[in-house]
Amino acid sequence: MLLLSADTETDSGGFHGPSLTDFYPPAIFFEGTPFEINRITLIRFLVVAVLLLIFWLGTRRMRVVPTRGQVALEFALNFVRQNIVIDTLGEKDGKRFMAPIMAIFFFVLGMNITGIIPFLNIAGSSTIGLPIVLALVSYVLFVYAGIKKFGFRYFKNSVVPSGVPVFALPIVAVIELVSTFILRPVTLALRLLMNMVAGHMLLVLCFSATQFFFFTVLADGNFLGLLGVGTFAFGAVFTLFELFVAVLQAYVFAFLAATYIQLSLADEH
């Protein structure tokens, strides 16, 4: 089904691979207004609705002997709770930040995984707006954590570490300021964006090539069209890899958000 929905428009039988225009689909509703909605926006709405439905169905009738759906949901929640939140923040601080870190993980996962779902075929996190919003949420969380514990001394202590020689303070302060308050959110957003863009481009390339080989080259009687078997096999394998990447990037994003909170709460501040 990915093959059927690959972007394979051709001109005079030529092959056209993926392009950045995939990430700027035409408006569907409210064109030309601040509320313009395109295909990617609809995918994001769909992901939010599906996530809410999954958690509502999974928690409305909890049973002592759990169903398979309840087991799967509990496994996912316990994975995030133990392997990201508790292992990074500990029990006390973990309880305080459990909800936002879990929300970040499942939201990023849901947005990422649409890139391999037939007829959606593009990640909701593959344009810069959403990664920026998620990075800003993480930014607010770790700054809030630092201010909550240390007051506004948090900013001073973050850019002026203790024990630094006086002559090195200006250089160290600039480095710490940039790395803590600028590079953290920027790298969070760009890491997620670049992984999703690259994955989409490779998948579309594989399945576009497959359709071209089968329905253009082979249909004309040229047996070079059998190369489509190889591109299809590579696309199928890469689809599984993209599933792994979708989960991994959700884990990395949530883990780094928790790590930045932990650094803000560290006693050195």
Residues of each region from the PLM?
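Selective transmembrane helix interface/packing segments
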Residues: 2-269
